[in-house]
């Protein structure tokens, strides 16, 4: 990341940099950084370098904070993929208790946000605060178990999951729902794909 910023510092046309954060940077709420995992801690650490370069080379930046992403053609297996994999599986998939309340956002909404930023980059450059965070989610929380039930309802198949077979990690995020009011007030943007519709779309691509 720092190498990228160093290269971009030689680009005089750079006006806006879009950083990507993680909801796991806010284990105890969005008021302060408290990373749940090492990965999210590196995201928080990078912000210091980004702020330094932005001040030194006078460019604007924002941070997009995706919540629990699903859909598309994932390069890594995500939470929802494990649930889908359990459908009518002969052997039960071991998971935690599934009580986490998460905000599931379809990858198409993430893409739409990035396109929106590109199309409206001048407006983002005029934001009063440099380094503004935009939390990308629907603003609605759903437990992992509830997601499994929706998947069963949509697919007409049964999830074979052994709930509680795995322990929660010591700093697991148990509640992560995007605060979306700022998105609506500052940039007039919100996610469009409801969870059930997104799951239907995702299952149809399987």
Report residues per predicted region.
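NAD(P)-dependent short-chain dehydrogenase/reductase
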Residues: 51-102, 107-118, 150-152
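Hydrophobic positions on the long internal alpha-helix
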Residues: 1-8, 49-50, 113, 117
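Active-site helix of classical SDR
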Residues: 38, 42-45
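A recurrent short beta-strand within the Rossmann-like NAD(P)-dependent oxidoreductase core
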Residues: 68-69, 93-94, 102, 114, ...
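C-terminal "lid/loop" region of Rossmann-like NAD(P)-dependent oxidoreductases
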Residues: 130-134, 143-148, 156-175
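Active-site beta-alpha turn of Rossmann-fold NAD(P)-dependent dehydrogenases/reductases
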Residues: 18-22, 65-67, 99, 137
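Conserved Rossmann-fold NAD(P)-dependent oxidoreductase catalytic core, especially the SDR/UDP-sugar
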Residues: 2-38
């Amino acid at each position: 990341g720092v190498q990228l910023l160093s290269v971009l510092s030689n680009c005089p046309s750079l006006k806006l940099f879009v950083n990507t954060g993680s909801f796991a940077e806010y284990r105890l709420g969005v008021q302060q950084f408290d990373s749940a995992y090492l990965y999210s801690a590196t995201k928080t650490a990078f912000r210091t370098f980004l702020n330094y370069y932005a001040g030194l080379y006078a460019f604007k930046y924002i941070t997009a904070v995706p919540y629990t992403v699903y859909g598309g053609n994932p390069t890594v297996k995500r939470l929802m993929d494990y649930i889908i994999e359990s459908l009518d599986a002969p052997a039960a998939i071991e998971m935690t208790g599934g009580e986490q309340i998460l905000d599931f956002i379809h990858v198409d909404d993430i893409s739409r946000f990035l396109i929106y930023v590109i199309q409206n980059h001048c407006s983002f450059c005029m934001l009063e605060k440099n380094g503004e965070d935009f939390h990308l989610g629907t603003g609605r929380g759903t437990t992992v178990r509830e997601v499994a039930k929706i998947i069963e309802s949509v697919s007409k198949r049964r999830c074979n999951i052994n709930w509680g077979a795995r322990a929660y990690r010591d700093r697991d995020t148990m509640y992560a729902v995007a605060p979306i009011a700022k998105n609506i007030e500052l940039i007039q943007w919100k996610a469009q794909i409801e969870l059930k519709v997104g799951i239907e779309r995702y299952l149809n691509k399987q």
